[in-house]
């Protein structure tokens, strides 16, 4: 049976095996998908041994996306620009192909919500690894992006890297342009730890819809809770993005595109 896995550390919290096995059942694909704990010191050796043992592909989650990318022989454009991958596929010639389906997963989920239309203004909060993976597909969907980060230089470096692909400008968190935004996307770790609000409430009130790339089982993420406390109710967490990026990884491996919305509805 074809073997796939998700690699991360920690990994017990991962929903990927549940999601991928639902996608396989829906599309009548015979495969096994498991969770694997990556060793912080010897991840590269583990991953190469996994593929040498006959595995067909895997997903990569924190903190290994950049390290896995370095092991690949060939890359999609979106993985190359992100310098990170969440998906590896073993090609027929034995080479490893790296892709990053995070951004197309986000775009697909925004389409599910009917929040994505050409030539919108999108405000992204945070310029870390999560953001790197989503910028190209958003720009390819003809979105105008303001990328805000506490450290302006980090936002500026990322915006400059992606400027050839569309309209993107950098801002610091306290110099965000005062204009309306069709979607505000939280890509900071505020969703994980609680912590302080990533941005001033007055900026949030300029938004029409609010998307958190994090998700929390059975409760609101801190960012979603903050939005609701301000009376901003057009909100979504990132669980749909998680299912959609999984569906795009599945499509790369199996050549079949599942109905991700059906699986999302089952699991949410």
Curated annotation (Swiss-Prot):
Catalyzed reaction equations: shikimate + NADP(+) = 3-dehydroshikimate + NADPH + H(+)
Binding locations of shikimate: 14-16, 61, 86, 102, 215
SUPFAM superfamilies given in the database record: Aminoacid dehydrogenase-like, N-terminal domain (SSF53223), NAD(P)-binding Rossmann-fold domains (SSF51735)
Protein name according to UniProt: Shikimate dehydrogenase (NADP(+))
A Pfam short name: SDH_C
Coiled coil: none
Function of the molecule: Involved in the biosynthesis of the chorismate, which leads to the biosynthesis of aromatic amino acids. Catalyzes the reversible NADPH linked reduction of 3-dehydroshikimate (DHSA) to yield shikimate (SA).
Keywords tagged on the record: Amino-acid biosynthesis, Aromatic amino acid biosynthesis, NADP, Oxidoreductase
One Gene Ontology cellular component annotation held by this UniProt entry: cytosol
Family statement: Belongs to the shikimate dehydrogenase family.
GO MF, one annotated term: NADP binding
Gene source species: Haemophilus influenzae (strain PittEE)
Binding partners and assembly: Homodimer.
Residues binding NADP(+): 126-130, 149-154, 213, 238
Active-site annotation: 65 (proton acceptor)
